């Protein structure tokens, strides 16, 4: 993200002095909580849906940075990377969920709750960025 920060005019000194926005920490904290506490098949289902939305956001951000701010490709590389679907992620996720279904290890209610909360925490992330003066 160094090239992106530089394109935004963020100096090394300013980056060191940055105080994280609490609302921007909720999503990664929740993903960590899921990794420690939730059943893998439930998390796979929730994250697969969330990553699809995230990839769309990244594609739109990269396009906007280039179109409206003339950011170079290097500055958009992070967003370009996540805008592209992982080559076999959906197939691997489907196989894992299918196996969990066959073994009655998928809690659909929990998976939906995790997905809903991931989306809510992601919205909190974006709203926190929007609120920065």
Give, region by region, the residue ranges found by the protein language model:
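Active-site-proximal alpha-helical scaffolds that flank and shape metal-associated catalytic sites
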Residues: 1-85
